[in-house]
A protein has these predicted regions:
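Active-site core of glycosidic bond-cleaving carbohydrate-active enzymes
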Residues: 1, 32-41, 45-49, 57, ...
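Helix-terminus loop motifs that line ligand-binding clefts
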Residues: 1-41, 47-58, 62, 66, ...
Length: 166
């Protein structure tokens, strides 16, 4: 429901919830996406312990709906001919301006892992790879690098020199 209300498809997971399962109030929560691949990760851990058809079927919809949101959240950057994450995006560090933050390292790496893992789930279920997810995977921005170091975010070239980010 949250994803649909925000103009995306699939399932968007909150950063934190109340004991009843409702999304907890947060000034940054709606802008965070680092937690999105978690359900795919958890399902994959269960699959590694119980690599059978029943496990694949049990978590099929969670994996699919999570990946569906992830693919719909990535936006096409015409200038760079690639998919990007953000803006609006609050990185896991919660220190960068959400209205200018793009391609945070943790999120880009986890996005790639999550979508690829969801594609492998489809294959294990005897399904073809999802074309839209694959387009995002094939054209997702890489990790930003400066002076041989991965930046916190592509939009933060001063990741290691600006004292605000230390």
């Amino acid at each position: 429901e949250t994803a649909r209300r925000q103009g995306y498809s699939g399932a968007r997971w909150p950063k934190m919830t109340s004991p009843s399962g409702a999304e907890s109030p947060s000034s940054v929560g709606p802008f965070l996406v680092w937690q999105q691949p978690h359900p795919i990760y958890y399902a994959e851990l269960v699959r590694r312990e119980r690599a059978d058809r029943a496990t694949l079927e049990r978590f099929r919809d969670v994996v699919h709906d999570t990946a569906e949101f992830m693919a719909s959240f990535a936006s096409w950057d015409d200038a760079g001919q690639r998919y990007v994450l953000g803006p609006v995006l609050q990185g896991a560090q919660e220190i960068f301006p959400k209205d200018r933050t793009v391609n945070t390292a943790f999120e880009v790496a986890y996005w790639r892992w999550g979508l690829e893992t969801a594609q492998r789930w489809r294959e294990r279920l005897g399904l073809d790879r999802e074309r839209r997810w694959q387009r995002v995977l094939d054209r997702l921005a890489g990790l930003a690098v400066r002076d041989g170091m991965y930046l916190f975010a592509e939009s933060a070239p001063e990741s290691f020199t600006d004292p605000r980010w230390a």
